Amino acid sequence: MRTYQPKPADVQRVWHVIDATDVVLGRLATQAATLLRGKHKPYFAPHIDTGDFVVVINAGKVALSGNKREQAQYHRHSGFPGGLRSTSYGELLDTRPQIIVEKAIKGMLPKNKLGRAQGTKLKVYAGPTHPHQAQQPTPFEIIQVAQ
């Protein structure tokens, strides 16, 4: 019997919504990356985009373990000499929390063309509302041990 190889036309895409309220950032990122890659499906293939769409809401209420709020830094560079800008995760969580969640999740995807395509199926929102109600996303519950 030959091994089944999924074709891109055979992939069934489902929309998931994850509530990030009081969920540790790393645990959220691993679960979301698994859904984006499609590793939860029985016909997963590493060379085909079999993943689902993931909508993360309440990104501003995500939990950071340890002293990451003060010590962890987000770096960006303008491309000019002396253009390195650093911001603590605490400041970023107060102003633009979706950046922290996106960076954590996309960092767990493959660093190639397929990973970039999978990253486009990630939608992150700081508040509890999102514009994807028409897709009827199913709630995805992240089970975690008490903090």
Swiss-Prot record:
NCBIfam families found in the cross-reference section: rplM_bact (TIGR01066)
Example of a GO MF term: structural constituent of ribosome
Subunit structure: Part of the 50S ribosomal subunit.
Matching Pfam families: Ribosomal_L13
UniProt keyword terms in alphabetical order: Ribonucleoprotein, Ribosomal protein
Record Gene3D superfamilies: Ribosomal protein L13 (3.90.1180.10)
Protein name per its UniProtKB record: Large ribosomal subunit protein uL13
Name of the gene: rplM
Annotated function: This protein is one of the early assembly proteins of the 50S ribosomal subunit, although it is not seen to bind rRNA by itself. It is important during the early stages of 50S assembly.
Coiled-coil features, chain-numbered ranges: none
Similarity section: Belongs to the universal ribosomal protein uL13 family.
